[in-house]
Amino acid sequence: MSPHTGWPRTVNSSLLKKHRSSLCTCQHTSSFLPRSFSTTADRHVQQSADFSSTSRSYDRLGRRAKEKLLDREFFLSLLSSASTKREAKSYLARLKAQYPKSPDENKPEPEKLATAPTLPSGVNLGSFYGASRSVYESPVFRQGPSPTAPPSLEPVERLHLALVRLSTPQSLDDNIIDGVAKTLSQLNRLGLTCCVVVDPGTEGVASTLRQVAIEQADRLAVAIQKQPDSKSLRLDSVFSIDASRPGLPQVSSRKALLNPLRHGHTVILTPIAYTEDVPRAIIVPANDAVLALTKELAGLASTPDPDEDPMVTAERIGRLQKEVSLDRVILLDSLGGIPAFNRRQTSHVFINMEQEYDDIENELLQAREMVPATETSLLKAGPSSIADNNPVSKFVNAEVVPVPSGPTQELKTAAPQRSAIEGHLENLRVAQKALTMLPAASSGIITSPFEVASSAQPSPTSEFSAVGTRRQRNPLIHNLLTDKPLLSSSLPMSRRGPTNNGQGTVYPVTSHTTFVKRGMPLTMLPNPWTEPWTPQSRPRLKLDDPSIDLPRLVHLIEDSFDRKLDVQDYLNRVNDRLAGLIIAGEYEGGAILTWELPPGVEDDGSEASNARMVPYLDKFAVLKRSQGAGGVADIVFNAMVRSCFPNGVCWRSRKNNPVNKWYFERSLGTWKLSDTNWTMFWTTPSLVEDSQKFRDYEAVCRSTQPSWADDTGVVD
């Protein structure tokens, strides 16, 4: 069996056990292991697992019982990380798409050859598939040599990777390191192999930082080896650098990096580069190492030859990009997610880089400049209403470093607070630079190792019972299964729900994890920052304006609603009352908003008429291929309620519309319209207290006529 065979990695796979044992015997002689490898396989490590039973009861269990407990813990972790069956099915569909069948597999086979048994690809479900080893290895009466399968000519299977940066692991205790190692092991079992860069920080001399990086890399490697069916390697001499020309380091050998990853090893790297002229070890910033790895794994590191045919260059780069898919860039930092100073939540749940990067960077820069001023004035005065209203003070006091009492602490807190904001700036910038080099499907996660480790802790229930409190969702596994953040970015703080700590006390759910996408540009017509959307705005935008691609807009609506639009009738209805248009990306999602008047109120442009106008969401559409993932709906909804109509908007939906649950969670109120099939939603504060406005909202939602071309009798 070739050591490059990509079997699914599970505890119950007997073939994997044979493969692993053969791999261990050849590790020291295999051609893919250069001298620079420092493998923990040479160390005697007790294979163990961290699950809910005590060590004594675990030792009394037999081998099969131990395997069942390990699988039980693994699958419980997965089930707790996926919110719905739809998310689990979506992950399985994406996983299946990663391993497409070759055209020859669909052809009938005239004769099956006796070959080595194959295992199903994708998420392995223990021994649910296939026969046992005794069946595979039973003797067969056959005279003459056994037939062999023809050599495979299929290309190398694409390797799906997560690039992880673990910051200052020397400050983390063993429980946190073990929790991180367990999560990395589970990601590996789910088909996402991890390459980890250990970041020792910047405090200390270069020689000390190099030693710390090596020690912490070995520490993490040992923790990963302790996980069931897990392998790790500390790989040295990965980076090279030209000392005469400052810049990013380069990956010395792509093959030496990818080979152990293809074997299922979690590869651990230190940010140490070696000069090209005279070999000398130089500590480089971990972020530079991450960007160098991203560039290499994205197939962009090769320098094009000016004499080479451009088509040949493009083909060569394309082959490199087909070898590897860098799906996730994960930044594990004790600071956690990117803080949100201008919003009610403590951190940004989701960042659409194309739209929000500049604003969030400026927000952090302004917060950094505010820290020294707040430090000298607020600490001496003690707690005050000013401090309570200052978003920077609230963040640094509650999230970064609690401020002790006493005058001796006044000068000691400014530096940590400023350093924390600079750390967030670095995390934001490295995520943006990395995602710029990757496909739009790739994403980034910025979270703390504490959150990852706490969600990886075993269930407190007995190993003999599956009944217990739902465990905290692991942000990394949840994101792999759903391609979404733990919490929706468009969900109001009041709707993010409580959580119980098991002792009767209920706490609000807050996320310190930031999900990052390269994302898509967002277009708002007219721009609400220069032309606010008000009833008095004249002249109004029209959908047949040259700045709007009407055919693509119509396709977006028809694809989302799965109905044919009567375009001319729709234009006649909305053109004279259009408030604005929101478009996400290349018409992947959008919203059409209008100013509507209740029946009987004349639109004469008077102040009384404008006061009765209702902000109305006429169409909210997302392409089918973008529904449920990518955050398109959240991007459009956030733009609507935060930028375009911050004072409120209303809309209607069929009472049996499956999207209503999503609407319920994001609206401030709902009202079922009697004698109709409609439910009215609104985000306007205190609407029910204004009886006239409420009646106007209801009248608009009752009277608006649809403009569908297919008269099926089904409303909207």
Swiss-Prot record:
Assigned GO CC terms: mitochondrial matrix
Catalysed reactions, semicolon-separated: L-glutamate + acetyl-CoA = N-acetyl-L-glutamate + CoA + H(+)
Listed pathway(s): Amino-acid biosynthesis; L-arginine biosynthesis; N(2)-acetyl-L-ornithine from L-glutamate: step 1/4
Primary location group: mitochondrion
Transit peptide location on this chain: 1-44
Region (Disordered): 99-119, 487-508
EC number(s) on file: 2.3.1.1
Occurrences of domain N-acetyltransferase (ranges): 537-706
Amino-acid biosynthesis is among the record's keywords: yes
GO molecular function per UniProt: L-glutamate N-acetyltransferase activity
Biased composition (Polar residues): 497-508
Localization terms from the record: Mitochondrion
Matching PROSITE patterns: GNAT_NAGS (PS51731)
Biased composition (Basic and acidic residues): 102-112
Keywords of this entry: Acyltransferase, Amino-acid biosynthesis, Mitochondrion, Transferase, Transit peptide
GO biological process: L-arginine biosynthetic process; ornithine biosynthetic process
Similarity remark: Belongs to the acetyltransferase family.
PANTHER family hit by this protein: AMINO-ACID ACETYLTRANSFERASE, MITOCHONDRIAL (PTHR23342:SF4), N-ACETYLGLUTAMATE SYNTHASE (PTHR23342)
Role description: N-acetylglutamate synthase involved in arginine biosynthesis.
Name by which UniProt lists this protein: Amino-acid acetyltransferase, mitochondrial
Source organism (scientific name): Neosartorya fischeri (strain ATCC 1020 / DSM 3700 / CBS 544.65 / FGSC A1164 / JCM 1740 / NRRL 181 / WB 181) (Aspergillus fischerianus)
